[in-house]
Amino acid sequence: MRRAMAEAPVGDDVYGEDPTTTALEQRVAELLGHEAGLLTPSGSMANVLGVRLLVEPGQELLCDSLAHVVRAEMGAHGALGGVTTRTWPSASRPGAPVGLVDPDVVEALMTPDAGPYLVSTAAVAVENTHNFGGGTITPLPVLQDLRERTRAAGVAVHLDGARLWNAVVAEGTGLAGLAAHGACADTVSVCLSKGLGAPVGSVLVGSAERVERARVLRKRLGGGMRQTGVLAAAGLHALDHHVDRLAEDHRRARELAAACAAARPGCVDPAAVRSNIV
């Protein structure tokens, strides 16, 4: 990976002149079945941009109560985008895994075009896998069900897919399964610096028009950088060499959970470890 970074062709990405960054953005967009992509310095920035593209100031974003967008992004969606958030319980039903999306619960909360009486719901954010849920995976059919309901209501979807790579590996589809997940959302963020092992960066994907808007917003937030090809090269290398290795991470996480449970019964449920978080 470091050799790829050192040898990467670079240019000025603010002017769209970095060939390695462009190649990464195009590749991730194609994998997720979207028109265009945008490299960002962090997953939080990718989420802020993705949500802001879908939610105008004063409109509402729905998400679960332990979602990264509402718990770990320092209030950025409200402070920087004027976005109102409303949440459903992360364990949406008794006994349900924390972070597992329940389309019935989400649909009951949506209030699109609410007029002068309630805040209008503009978008729903879902997270797959779910960080604070310990790597909970929402199965693809559930996301597809949610997508049908939100589409019928005229509500957009942002997918925080920081660990989406882990979800598709756990499902057994690998990179080939990404497009089906991408089709469940209007904007998707994926992280290169978690399980994939790149040093920096996330990619936001969406329509070409939305990504052009995001490029402007990224600069406004201080995320426009110059010779980003040295970072993008790491992402490209990770996509070529590290995705399949996530299965090994998952195996080790299960082994760690089993060992912890054996040493101190009740401290962790090994059956709940489906990806790489214990």
PLM feature spans:
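Conserved PLP-enzyme active-site core in the AAT-like
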Residues: 1-8, 13-278
